[in-house]
Regions:
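Juxtamembrane segments flanking the first transmembrane helix
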Residues: 24-59, 65
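Sec/Tat signal peptide C-region and signal peptidase I cleavage site
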Residues: 13-23
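Amphipathic coiled-coil signal-relay and dimerization helices
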Residues: 68-74
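Absolute protein N-terminus
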Residues: 1, 23-24
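Membrane-proximal, non-catalytic sensory/regulatory domains of signal-transducing membrane proteins
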Residues: 47-61, 86-119
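Bacterial N-terminal signal peptides that target proteins for export
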Residues: 1-8
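Extracytoplasmic/periplasmic sensor domains and loops in membrane signaling proteins
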Residues: 27-43, 74-102
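Short hydrophobic beta-strand segments that form the core of ligand-binding sensory/regulatory domains
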Residues: 122-127
Length: 127
């Protein structure tokens, strides 16, 4: 009985810790996107954030409202509408205040925080 109780305790603690890390990751993703939106609205361009598209584990992507990808690890210069319409439909729900969206990308469920800039760019990142 003690072994069973110990296993349950370890499982519960593991889930609690994973949830804490998960919340911290969501906060980091949101902060990163918010900082980039503020920088773009302060005069930076999407091209200034090309290095952010290479960061792991949560790369940043920036696209125009029409779906043209400006910053992304592999889709730069392509239309997200043509490459992945469901992903485009999700990220195009970006608001000036930011919102979390879900979509499927390469058979995996994705969650992304997306915000729109005053000039209509969409900045996002997720897991």
């Amino acid at each position: 009985m003690k072994k069973y109780a110990l296993m349950v305790l370890v499982l519960v603690m593991g889930l609690a810790l994973a949830g804490g890390v998960f919340a911290a990751d969501k906060d980091a993703i949101k902060s990163q996107v918010d900082e980039i939106v503020a920088a773009i609205e302060g005069g930076k361009t999407a091209a200034d954030f090309k290095d952010a598209a290479k960061k792991e584990p949560y790369y940043v992507y920036i696209l125009q409202e029409d779906g043209m990808v400006l910053v992304h690890p592999s889709l730069e210069g392509k239309s997200l509408k043509e490459a992945a319409m469901p992903a485009y439909e999700a990220v195009s729900k970006a608001t000036p205040d930011g919102t979390w969206v879900q979509y499927t990308w390469k058979d995996a469920e994705k969650n992304a925080y997306v915000r729109s800039t005053k000039d209509g760019l969409i900045v996002g990142s997720g897991y």
